[in-house]
Amino acid sequence: MRIAFISPFFPLEGGIARFSGLLAAALREQRRDDVVPLAFRALFPPFIAKGAEAPLPDEFRLVLFNPFSWLETIQRLRSLKPDIVLVAFWTGFLAPLFYVVRRFTGIRMVVLLHNLSSHESFFIEPLLQRLLAASADGVLTLSSSVSQEVKAAMPAIPLLQLFHPVYEPEGSLPSVVDARHELHLDSSAPVLLFFGYVRSYKGLETMLRAMPAILLREPLLRLVVAGHFYEDVSFYRRLVDHLGLGGNVDLYPGYVSTERSALYFAAADAAVLPYRSATQSGVVQLAYGHGRPVIVTPVGALPEMVRPGETGWVAGDASPEGLADAVGEFLDSRERLASMRPAIEAFRRDYSWEAFAVSAGKFLETIAAGR
């Protein structure tokens, strides 16, 4: 089956690009599908986009804010004659593009839905969701919370709920001792990692406000924050100073390479996701891929990805107090973290890219056939 896949791909930054690249590879390997990436060159104008630009291959032609590139993509699809178009969707601003592609090619389309509702909603979102519904012949979701939204918003569209596969580490991992030495962390202190893009809904502020209560319990605990800040990092630096956390919080703003991410996870005892809202998060899967448990808030699909006491801990709520209590549970369990590894390994096997590709491929075949 020939699949045209519209999405960001590496070397663009972000979890969507990484997810789509791994899915394309798994579809080729497990099913021998001919997956043709139709890759974005840019998603936002330079004055909005933040972060360093990586050189992109010439075939990365699609520009979300340039309708002329949409027309070129339509022409490419007409030449490719794929059996199905698979599109990655995580923000409403993609809906007009996908609507135009579906209408002017006539090729059936499956939406790989990371999020239906944006984390930071805006007034035209209902209109954009209607455009998406008019474009989709089928929908793939990664969590039950998103599936429920889809069933309510577009009940007539075929839906397959799958899962977010685990990200396996690339290359060898540094030892805990070496990683902590390089990051200037105490070899025996508890270390938590907040990893990935820093945006308001991800709750770093909440985690920082939980830290004073946590430090009353364990004064040596360190919080490592690594990722690209979509907000002013100086706000967080001032908050760290205001709360007296300078000796317990390390901020590493900016793009994190694969090698550097392995260093952070190797140094950490657990990853913390203090999200205020969420659907699912690739950070959980990345932590499991590195053999680390997680501490999450009870929002969106995050609790679905945690087996309490076996692969991590779920806070009672998304408040500083709730997070402090969950970290307390982690501290109580720290001596037996090694015993959690078999459960994390089992999760990795169950949530593999191979299993995802087999199920997704069968669904794509069904939609392509009009069934």
Which residues make up each language-model segment?
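A short, well-ordered alpha-helix in the C-terminal region of glycosyltransferases
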Residues: 190, 336-350
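Nucleotide-activated donor-binding/catalytic signature segment of Leloir-type glycosyltransferases, i.e.
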Residues: 234-262
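Conserved acidic donor-binding segment of nucleotide-sugar-dependent glycosyltransferases
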Residues: 308-309, 313-320, 328-335
